[in-house]
Every structure is written in C-alpha cells, then in structure tokens.
C-alpha cells in the first residue's frame, strides 16, 4: 500500500555495537521501507562513552541503497544538560544523522570534519590542523574501539540485565525469556563460542542475497567482524590474522582498551585550544570510558576463559579484577539513567 511504510531497524537484533544489516531490506521489494537508526547509545556506553556513530550508518548504506528507502528514523533522547546530550561528542551523532538523512552519499569522515569545524576547531586552519587531525581520527576510530572492548568479532547481547550498561555475559535471570539472556547469543562452551546462524544452525544466512549467503554461511569466508554472529566457532579456529579465535578475541578486547587510552592522550592536546569547561568535561568522560573498557575486557575474557581453558597471549594486558567480584556489580539505574563517576567507582 502506498500509504504504509514499514520501519525496520538497521540490524536484525537491537542496535548492537555491530550487526549485519537486517535481511528484511530487499526482501519485500513491493513494500515501502524505511530504516531506523539509534542515535542514543543504549548499548554503546550511554553518554559516558565517546562513540561517533556515522561510520556504523555508513556501513549500513554500503549494503542497502539509500534510493531503496522512503525515509529514515533516528531513536534519540535528550536530557537537561546544557548541550542536551550529556557527552559533547554525542552531539556529533545528532548532526551526522541529519546530514546523512539529507545526503546519504556523504562520508562519515566528511561529516566529522564539518562538525569539528563548527564545534571546536577548523581542520583547514594551519594553526589548528595538527590538533584537529588527531581529534578527527579519534572520532573515526571511536565506534570500532567500542566494538573491540565490548563485543568484538560478531559477539552481541553481552550487556547487563535491565539497564544495559556494562558487561554481564553470565547473566541468568530465573523465569526470564531465553532470548533475553546473553548465553542465548554467545553460546560459549568447551568447544567454542558464537551463534550458529548458518545452514547447520538457524539458517538465518539463507535470508540474505545469494552472494552474501554464501559468504556468511561458510566459516572459511565469513568476515571476522561477523564470525560469531553467524557461526559457533571452535576456540582453535584460525582467523584471518593467523591467530586462533581465542587469541584474536583477547587481542581485540585489549586493542579496544588501548584505543581509549590513546583517545585520552589525543584529547589532552586540545587543552590550549578550547574552553576549559568542555575540555574538562570530555577529559572526565574519557577517564570513565577507559575504566569501563577495562571492566568490559576483564569481565568477558575472564568469563569466556572458563570455557576455553586457554591462556591470554603474553602481549595482552592482564586483568585487574576477579571474575567473582565482577559478577557482584549491580548498578542502581534504569534504562534512562547514566551512571555517575562516583557510582561507577564505588561499584565496579
């Protein structure tokens, strides 16, 4: 019907840090469709974490032609902060959504450059260029860093029960729906980890066009970033890097932590170029993000290590938490509250 548009989330589950695009796009060629993105960071650290989301949306448009859509929606919320968004860099996601909705051919890099020029400093100004270049890179790397320290290699739904802030891959709530539990998705056991959506499992790969179906269905050709979305892979599975799956998982979590620490250093370069209030605000939030990244890394690797029985590679930073202590972390918040630094420091 011409007066009906079916609104579809960008991915098959629910705005995870990385999902393949929903196969509903293209499956109903006679039905008007629109995509639903999430601007607010329900699963990407709320307004405590820097996560520039335009690369995620650009990734979606690599698979789904904008011309096939009738409209775009963005799920967002605002608060009482002066900047409405909490994190100063969360404003960039509102801006990027508007720019991509108007012109989806724009690159996420171009949009980040526009936003930086209007918000902090001009990339083309020789005085600001070196600093702006570093902050532009920080923005462009931020979403991938979140993927790495939260749910790399296609993992998803590992977050805490209820409010979705922080890791809880062990979560098991008696009487709750099985598909609300992390174990329903990660399916970690002594043999391996990941959700088998190939032809030997749920066969979700068959919902994609033939070329992608073949790519995703074969564990030998499935891209690393979607491996554990589509396959229950053995811990010793050889990744594209040549590492085992377990080693690659460790390296990805560790890389995410190191990335956030590099963001702290890059941001410190801006102190003499912007106002003190915004400088300190972002600096404080990056401290939270750095500690949260370690929290995620330790929680997930210590938990999954109970199944793999394998040691972390020598180069990977060792945990600073005990698994049993992490299992006791409970934040007294709901979906619409962002934990404060004081709360996090007392509880995680």
Positions of predicted regions on the chain:
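Gly/Pro-rich turn-and-neighbor structural signature
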Residues: 1-28
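Beta-sheet entry/capping signal
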Residues: 3-5, 32-36, 71-73
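Generic structural motif
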Residues: 11, 40-42, 120
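Flexible loop/turn segments at secondary-structure boundaries
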Residues: 13-16, 42-47, 82, 145, ...
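Eukaryotic scaffolding regions of large macromolecular assemblies
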Residues: 17-19, 47-50, 54, 86, ...
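Active-site clefts of carbohydrate-active enzymes
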Residues: 31-59, 76-77
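Catalytic domains of carbohydrate-active enzymes that cleave complex glycans
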Residues: 62, 67-348
């Amino acid at each position: 019907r011409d007066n009906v548009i079916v609104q579809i989330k960008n991915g098959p589950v629910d705005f995870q840090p990385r999902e393949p695009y929903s196969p509903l796009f293209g499956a109903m060629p006679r039905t008007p469709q629109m995509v639903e993105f999430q601007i607010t960071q329900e699963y990407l650290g709320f307004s405590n974490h820097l996560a520039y989301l335009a690369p995620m949306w650009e990734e979606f448009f690599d698979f789904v032609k904008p011309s096939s859509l009738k409209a775009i929606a963005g799920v967002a919320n605002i608060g009482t902060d002066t900047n409405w968004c909490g994190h100063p860099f969360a404003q960039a996601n509102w801006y990027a959504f508007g720019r991509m909705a108007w012109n989806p051919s724009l690159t996420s890099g171009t949009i980040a450059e526009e936003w930086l020029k209007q918000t902090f400093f001009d990339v083309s100004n020789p005085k600001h260029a070196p600093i702006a270049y570093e902050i532009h890179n920080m923005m462009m790397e931020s979403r991938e860093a979140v993927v790495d320290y939260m749910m790399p290699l296609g993992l998803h739904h590992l977050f805490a029960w209820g409010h979705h802030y922080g890791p809880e891959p062990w979560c098991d709530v008696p009487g709750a729906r099985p598909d609300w539990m992390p174990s329903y998705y990660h399916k970690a056991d002594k043999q391996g980890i990941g959700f088998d959506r190939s032809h030997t499992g749920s066969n979700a790969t068959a919902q994609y066009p033939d070329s992608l179906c073949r790519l995703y269905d074969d564990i030998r050709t499935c891209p690393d970033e979607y491996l554990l979305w589509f396959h229950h892979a053995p811990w010793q599975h050889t990744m594209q890097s040549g590492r085992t799956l377990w080693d690659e998982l460790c390296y990805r979590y560790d890389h995410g932590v190191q990335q956030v620490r590099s963001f702290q250093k890059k941001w410190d370069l801006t102190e003499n170029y912007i106002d003190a209030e915004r400088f300190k605000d972002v600096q404080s939030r990056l401290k939270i993000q750095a500690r949260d990244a370690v929290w995620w890394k330790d929680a997930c690797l210590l938990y999954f290590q109970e199944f793999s029985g394998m040691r972390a590679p020598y180069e990977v930073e060792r945990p600073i938490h005990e698994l049993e202590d992490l299992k006791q972390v409970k934040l007294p918040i709901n979906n619409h509250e962002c934990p404060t630094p004081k709360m996090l420091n007392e509880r995680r």
